[in-house]
Amino acid sequence: MMEHTLKAFDADLQELARMIAEMGGLAERQIGDALDALNRRDTALARDVIAADARVDSLQRQIEEKAILTIARRQPMAVDLRDLVGALRVSNDLERIGDLAKNIAKRVEVMDSELSLQKVMRGIEHMTELVLTQIKEVLDAYARRDVAKAMQVWRADEEVDAVNNSLFRELLTYMMEDPRNISLCTHLLFCAKNIERMGDHATNIAETIYYMVEGYILPDDRPKGDHTSTTNIPYRN
């Protein structure tokens, strides 16, 4: 009976891991497509990004239901319980990453397609590449329960913040130089902030991995270098 229970619990954990991996892959694709849509002012692709978020949301709900049901049925303790709590936390962060990609896509739909700030866009592309690397590496660390790799992601967040700070100053300069730039620059400010927040969620996942493996919350303060005053306000029609 005990062996059967253990096998059933292992199957539950494997199914949660599979759903987390699928969710992570979808979130990564959303980010890449959102950046492409922003670069090309491609409203059709932006709408695809918005529509794709429904699957990410659905997976998050399935993971939540599965994890809670498993806790209720199996009454796990110690590392087994932390694995389930970790799955809940990671799925929540991935769902938020998907929402942030969707917010960028929503802005693409209303941005002026005639204006372009190539230097700023290169900075946004660079920050997106950094964040995608963070997400890929932290998901690999989650799958392997690799604390050392998770901590590399945790420390890398400062570089993302530094790029965001630079973009913030640059966009403010463009707005002060020419009022015609204000609308576009405002949208790009929020796009950059959304990407920076994705990095924060990758850092959250790194902290969750530490908790899952070590059994306690990471004691050190998070390395933050974000000095912008822009808050993350989702764009809504």
Regions found by a protein language model. Give the residues of each.
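Cytosolic, long alpha-helical scaffolding segments
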Residues: M1-N237
